[in-house]
């Protein structure tokens, strides 16, 4: 093989990689715009565990923002997080389409279960956080509030929107990644 043929093969691989990355990026941007349109609904969904815990507690709570741009930036963050969460299977499929032509048939068959299980396990980790961990964690942390004694001030939660949603998104991401452990270990 001549040097020019090697360079041609290398350039074609880079071109294919570029095409796959551009498809992934365009898909992510499209879903980001869609998610931004529905950002308030997504925000409501992510805040629901907090709202339910507060309602069960019987206290009058709210989420606050302390900077003028905080709500806007929170909607941007929520939209990007949701778009990334939704497009992850598509991005993995693009990576697969780039890698698959270089694999033998038996290698493709061996990897296929992992490709299917990866997004499923990530989604299950996110569901565990949303439906089980967050409600329990919120109730646990709210139990540390105090009414104050005659000599001390009460400790009361004034949760910031951005901090709460950052916690929820970090936990969803962390549990989604930790649910990948069976794939990594096998």
Outline where the language-model segments fall:
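Membrane topogenic/interface segments and analogous intrinsically disordered interaction regions
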Residues: 1-186
